[in-house]
């Protein structure tokens, strides 16, 4: 059996209090450096927020001053950590979706004063006035309901319900055996047109 090599340990300091004090100072120096980096990053974020908020005035963000550091005393090993500054809130960007329309797009999210009345069910509404636009859009996009809703909202400014789009896709589908859908119902039988 080969003799094991002994690990060389650094010689312990002669005075333990000096050793503990030097360790506490190193920890405090590292914490102060971390705090300075955090404050610099917060200052950069604050300047970015000020640049973004040139369009609309917003209340300024006040950062609390750093708390005084506590030092370790005696031969206690416990060091107290400084309270961290609260994380900065993420900057909200305006809503820039291509399919948002209207004057409220990207503005405050407070509902208009009549929104409480509009929350109730409104009953039947005829979509017949938009029939040609719905059918043309569904045929052009291959029957994709989600795309048709976004497209019609963007180009016509009307949010069509999904069930209406499903109805027109089924009724006027070019893939039905009943033909192109003109004058036919969902069962594929042609209706007799009344003259008179």
From Swiss-Prot:
Localization (cell): Host nucleus
Keyword Ribosomal protein appears in the UniProt entry: no
Extent of Low complexity compositional bias: 55-64, 71-82
Induction line: Expressed at the late phase of the viral replicative cycle. Probably already expressed from the early to late transition.
Biased composition (Acidic residues): 14-54
Pfam families, A to Z: Adeno_L433K_22K
Any one of the GO BP annotations: viral DNA genome packaging
The entry's keywords: Activator, Host nucleus, Host-virus interaction, Late protein, Repressor, Transcription, Transcription regulation, Viral genome packaging, Viral release from host cell
Disordered: annotated span: 1-125
A cellular component annotation (GO) from this entry: host cell nucleus
Family: Belongs to the adenoviridae splicing factor family.
Role of this protein: Component of the packaging machinery which encapsidates the viral DNA into preformed capsids and transcriptional activator of the viral major late promoter (MLP). Binds, along with packaging proteins 1 and 3, to the specific packaging sequence on the left end of viral genomic DNA and plays an active role in packaging of the viral genome into preformed capsids. Specifically binds to the 5'-TTTG-3' nucleotides of the repeats making up the packaging sequence. Forms a transcription factor called DEF-A through cooperative binding with packaging protein 1.
Extra information: All late proteins expressed from the major late promoter are produced by alternative splicing and alternative polyadenylation of the same gene giving rise to non-overlapping ORFs. Expression of packaging protein 2 and splicing factor is controlled by a L4 promoter distinct from the major late promoter.
Subunit (UniProt): Part of a genome packaging complex composed of packaging proteins 1, 2 and 3; this complex specifically binds to the packaging sequence on the left end of viral genomic DNA and performs packaging of the viral genome. Self-assembles into higher-order structures.
Name listed for the protein in its UniProt record: Packaging protein 2
Organism expressing this protein natively: Human adenovirus C serotype 5
